[in-house]
Amino acid sequence: MLGLAGFFIYIYLFHVDILGIIATAQTANPLIYAVAILFGLMEVLFFTISWRELTNYLSIKMSIGRAYLYVWYGLYVDTIVPAQSISGEVTRTYLLIRDKCGPFGKIVASLFAHRLLGMAINVVALIAGIILLYFGGQTSPIVFNLIIIVTITITALIFLMVIFSYKQRWTLKTITWATKIAQKITFGRWKSGKLKDQAIEITEHFHNAMKEFRYNPKSIATSLFYLTVTWIFSLSVPYLVFLSLDHPVSWSMILITSSIVLAVKAIPVGIPFEVGLPEAVMTTLYFSMGVPPALAATATILVRIITLWMRFFIGFVAQQYLELKPSKSPTANPEKTKIHPQL
């Protein structure tokens, strides 16, 4: 609630008419807004299908219904844990391990690859947005510089993550270095042999799974297709919200604002980004692109009802269901991931 209070303080400091916000919200077309809500649900569904395409290839046993619940559970944790950028993935990892769906290394590989695909699409969306703005004559120097910084940051992270995923020796050296440090800190009292062996086994599963993706682009392409559909639904939500307020906006503005917000959330640095800060960022970006202040704040609130509060409550229901009814699915196929010969 502190985040929401901060958002309303932000509105007050920038002299946004709160009564105007309420009056504008009351004019929203309920039918169009209902479609926006439906698109918000479809966004999560296709995100789930995209991720499950990767888990299926790695023989991680999980039905589409179960995967959908896992994603909703992760979204719920995203809103309450101040490490939003990775908390949902950690939650899904925990659930898959708890329900014995597959080896830890393979599970992490599926989430790692899925995050890489999402970040790549984000970069494409940012570039497309700035091109549309440029040719539309709406380019703001501040927004342009922000997009450049975000795009470079995400691209650099993608590059580093790809290198890490294929350099098994680096990971093994990191494990060895970490265990030596731990032994020095504990003066040799901590016996790290068993834990080190487990870490090496997990690392092998992870890197073998990433090699499998490398030699089978079909699963990556299919996942990328569904993730693209996810993005279309995601971008349609704010567009429909503005449409419901009888204020159509350009797709370039939607691309830019959505990409910047999602880009910051995608950077794994543990920023508590779910309540307060995104509202301020969205309102500022809308205003900087010519949307009246009261309308910008109203649209932000209506969008966040769908992308935050609806997810919070549905995620809470999913969390309760999964905790009360753990999976009874059989243990995943113990066969290790095959390693293709190096070309």
What is the predicted role of each segment?
Residues 65-69, 84, 88, 100-116, ...:
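Membrane-interface alpha-helices at helix entry/exit sites of multi-pass transporters
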Residues 76-83, 259-279:
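Transmembrane alpha-helix interface/packing and boundary motifs in multi-pass membrane proteins
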Residues 95-103, 279-295:
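Interfacial segments of multi-pass membrane proteins
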